[in-house]
Amino acid sequence: MSVNRILVINPGSTSTKIGVFDNERPVLEETIRHDEEQIGKYKRIIDQYEFRKETILEVLHSHGINISKLNAVCGRGGLLRPIEGGTYTVNDAMLEDLKNGFSGHHASNLGGILAYEIASGLNIPAFIVDPVVVDEMEPIARISGIAGMERKSIFHALNQKAVARKVAEELNHKYEDLNLLVTHMGGGITVGAHKKGKVIDVNNGLNGEGPFSPERAGTVPVGQLVEMCFSGEYYRDEMIKKLVGQGGLVSLIGTNDAIKVEQMVEKGDPEATLIYKAMAYQVAKEIGGASAVLHGKIDAIVLTGGLAYSKILVDEIKERVDWIADVIVHPGEDELQALAEGALRVLREEEAPKEYIVREKETVARG
């Protein structure tokens, strides 16, 4: 089998994770930590791309990586327009939306730009894979009870789809032939109904749907939320933080560290026990609801993400949902590996690269 060498780039707010893979095998994985004062000099996140590019190239050189031997560069997908899942070739339309922050400004927008900047000089393809804006929801799933307020698809697409493919392989099937309920449990929690390779429904794990998580509130009583918003006690930004960042375990028990909460549970703390069980309860309830989306025809329930390492949490969830289907646990996430595998599927011609297309009617982002 021929070897495809792939450079993978995953930018964060103050760091850039890079990996070099020979097919599925990691040759190099490194987290480059950027000096906050240095990156603070740039007015916009997007202006950091040249600085980050040079830093990446220096690190590769220091490890003896000859970039002329690369077959492709793959970056983390950013805040683009809603697109279906898959591996996309970075093109001019995508670069424009990433640079302009069409759907928002985030460090992940640098992924496609950095991939393109490095790849174009080597005359090799640049890709992104399954960004958070992956949207494969069916029309019926978009309807909410307020006109003009559509439900949105924002979830852990990269890890959910990567793990779903692994599970399909373990079951000796193609991802596109199975119905799976995939639950990513990390700082946020998302439950996706995967129908024959498409995530036809999923809770918006970013800002206000589904189970509460270590730092997100999830679905809350709407009437009480409205009263809180108009109480005069909070600014808008404070309310957003209550939903994202200071919600969930942070609000209820004062920490987003699930390990600390587990230690409290093991010591018999009644409040910690109730709250941790409540999080598992809400995850199980979301899985149960998603099973109805697939008419109960489920090949497997998959638990993944950092919290899937928690035996207490996993056992609580299993106890409530294992009557629906077998529960398969794949703890953690490996974004670099997932990106490399997405690029590799295209290089091996197992799937065709997708094209990012901007349609005339899409003058504003869904957001």
Curated annotation (Swiss-Prot):
Gene3D superfamilies: 3.30.420.40
Cellular component GO terms, alphabetical: cytoplasm
Protein name: Probable butyrate kinase
SUPFAM superfamilies: Actin-like ATPase domain (SSF53067)
Keywords for the protein's UniProt record, in alphabetical order: ATP-binding, Cytoplasm, Kinase, Nucleotide-binding, Transferase
PANTHER family assigned to the protein according to its UniProt record, in alphabetical order: ACETATE KINASE (PTHR21060), BUTYRATE KINASE 2-RELATED (PTHR21060:SF3)
One GO MF term: acetate kinase activity
SS bond list: none
Positions of transmembrane segments: none
Enzyme Commission code: 2.7.2.7
Species for this entry: Bacillus cereus (strain ZK / E33L)
Principal cellular location given in the protein's record: cytoplasm
Catalytic activity: butanoate + ATP = butanoyl phosphate + ADP
GO BP, one annotated term: acetate metabolic process
Entry annotated with the keyword Cytoplasm: yes
Gene behind this protein: buk
Localization of this protein: Cytoplasm
Pfam families named in the record: Acetate_kinase
InterPro entries hit by this protein: Aliphatic_acid_kin_short-chain, Aliphatic_acid_kinase_CS, ATPase_NBD, Butyrate_kin
Family, as annotated: Belongs to the acetokinase family.
